[in-house]
């Protein structure tokens, strides 16, 4: 199904009240992640997988130069995507599938992890956040978190950092 030009896939939980987890994907890996997570966890949940084709644009909070020579730079259109996600995509899924989730979480990897944490400052729809190897090196993000108050009152936050960033010659990372 497409909403706001984005391909979304819903993997419905057993119950209408199952938590709703939003996962931004870049390579359509939602189905595989859902399958593996269901095998590893007894917890029931509904997964909303959103395909992000404009990754460097939709996942970044503001414009920034490329962090690597092979990268194209960052457009900084996260606020536009947050608006689409919170005003059209999530409400549309809740209505279409008659959901009443016990909570709504957002998870992401790399720039998606940055986006998950940034969204905590921009909307209160999410109460749980997972930033997996999040791009927390993003220029200005640490300062942003120090100067701003989250819109959400997080119930839980999971942050993991990769081990390759420390070994790179790139001073930004």
Which residues does each predicted region cover?
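Serine-hydrolase catalytic machinery in alpha/beta-hydrolase-like enzymes
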Residues: 7-9, 15-96
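A general structural motif
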Residues: 16-18, 44, 101-103, 126, ...
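Cell-envelope and extracellular/periplasmic
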Residues: 17-19, 24-27, 94-97, 120-121, ...
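Active-site loop->helix "elbow" adjoining a glycine-rich segment at hydrolase catalytic centers
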Residues: 81, 110-113
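Short glycine-enriched nucleophile-adjacent loop
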Residues: 113-123
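The feature captures the conserved acid-bearing segment of alpha/beta-hydrolase catalytic domains
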Residues: 136-173
């Amino acid at each position: 199904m497409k909403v706001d030009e984005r391909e979304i896939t819903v993997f419905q939980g057993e119950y209408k009240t199952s938590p709703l987890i939003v996962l931004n994907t870049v390579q359509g890996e939602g189905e595989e992640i859902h399958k593996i997570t269901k095998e590893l966890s007894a917890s029931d949940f509904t997964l909303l997988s959103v395909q992000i084709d404009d990754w460097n644009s939709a996942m970044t909070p503001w414009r920034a130069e490329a962090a690597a020579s092979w990268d194209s730079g960052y457009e900084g259109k996260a606020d536009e995507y947050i608006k689409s996600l919170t005003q059209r995509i999530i409400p549309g899924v809740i209505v279409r599938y008659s959901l009443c989730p016990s909570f709504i979480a957002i998870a992401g990897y790399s720039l998606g992890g940055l986006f998950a944490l940034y969204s905590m400052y921009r909307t209160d729809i999410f109460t749980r956040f997972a930033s997996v190897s999040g791009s927390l090196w993003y220029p200005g993000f640490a300062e942003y978190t120090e100067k701003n108050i989250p819109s959400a009152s997080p119930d839980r936050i999971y942050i993991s950092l990769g081990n390759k960033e420390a070994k790179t010659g790139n001073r930004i990372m």
